């Protein structure tokens, strides 16, 4: 138990220590200031901008920025889709893997361009090396950079005033890849290789075991993809077992690096925001609220897994309980990680829009599974994905400012800018589109007989498997309850739709809000006379409960039919 507390404290301290330097670095990169990596990144950026031509030089309005973002995503989608369909005739296909069916290729392409990395295939048997490296790994970089671009555009809109432009998407995209994601990923990949993660393009090995049978050992360019998988909060595993596989996550060191890299950029953006708007206290308040939400989720999930079987009334279980004192849920977990390392990793991955797992979420207790769903359902705002976590949290921040200001009889304003009805329309659109998407698609799937046939469990847990899939898709997480066999035409298409709506619907609202904020006057006098201090402890509490009430209650009825009912059923076993 003491070792668990030490690990947790070390993890939190590490995140806190890297937040300021990495946040300052991100600020310098996007504010066109000199950095230590200019010598490495600038040559790539010059070539990239030369190819783009004039489109990369002019500042863009919100509509132009969004149009460029969508145009890029459409091109990326077509690129990935074609490779997945034709991978059977493309090079570097040592296992002679055939091209995907169109519905599965469509689902996978949408999944990777939206930074979701939902996988209805097994990586080691469903995708060739060529497709892994050129299609999926590349999207791990650029889809993360797209989210980062949106966050930076939003931050600019708060910092700027009385102008019409929020930056240039193409320029921001290059900076996100060449200055931030690529250099850090190279370092992480090298560390992974030294820790035993394979990095090659050799055919799978056929070995004879001591039992006299033949076993196929998969390998491939794993380290390079694993590095950006976590740093870019992508989560899609090279193997079906994801980070539970010893080739993806061989040691406690790689496990720790993956957890830190998942939160690194999301945490740093809180400081980037504070520094850019000239109020670092505001950034640290955001960091603090995120941290409290994370700790609560981790505590509930860990206690549920450590003591989740204590209440079962089976005589055999009670006999064991009498001998050992308590029963921990080790089903679906690697013995080398144990309960706490598993729950910590999965709390991190579901809090961020990562979706990587080092244990089987479907085998978690219903209460722990519910916490994983809640982490995603509130909009992935507990640090969240690269960029997406920050702009998702900012929507709740705007709502809290609006509610708090009206409660004390003041005109809503944030950092000297008046918050008006149009701003709140975009805010509520961003906050409600994903929950609506989840509830509609889950309700439809729950009454379709063909979906029932894909479930390995019935009743409340079967419903939880469906609910989890659409929560994960709409919030761009990508993790799953493995009891759902997702490779059907209906699930491939509807989950793809939920990923598209959850990603680009929210981004559209965020960029439109940025376009509104950037045009406003910034009155320091307005900020000073307002009695709503947005850096105070009271305001932090208001933001905290706004997230729980608005984010949590929208999905609570569905949770009542799934994991809550599942937990109550277990109590009476």
Curated annotation (Swiss-Prot):
GO terms for cellular component: plasma membrane. InterPro entries: KdpA. It is a multi-pass membrane protein. It is found in: Cell inner membrane. Keywords: Cell inner membrane, Cell membrane, Ion transport, Membrane, Potassium, Potassium transport, Transmembrane, Transmembrane helix, Transport. The keyword RNA-binding does not apply. The chain crosses the membrane at residues 6-26, 66-86, 135-155, 177-197, 257-277, 283-303, 382-402, 428-448, 493-513, 537-557. GO terms for molecular function: P-type potassium transmembrane transporter activity; potassium ion binding. The keyword Metal-binding does not apply. Part of the high-affinity ATP-driven potassium transport (or Kdp) system, which catalyzes the hydrolysis of ATP coupled with the electrogenic transport of potassium into the cytoplasm. This subunit binds the periplasmic potassium ions and delivers the ions to the membrane domain of KdpB through an intramembrane tunnel. Belongs to the KdpA family. HAMAP family: KdpA. The system is composed of three essential subunits: KdpA, KdpB and KdpC. This is Potassium-transporting ATPase potassium-binding subunit. It comes from Francisella tularensis subsp. mediasiatica (strain FSC147). The lineage of its organism: Bacteria, Pseudomonadati, Pseudomonadota, Gammaproteobacteria, Thiotrichales.
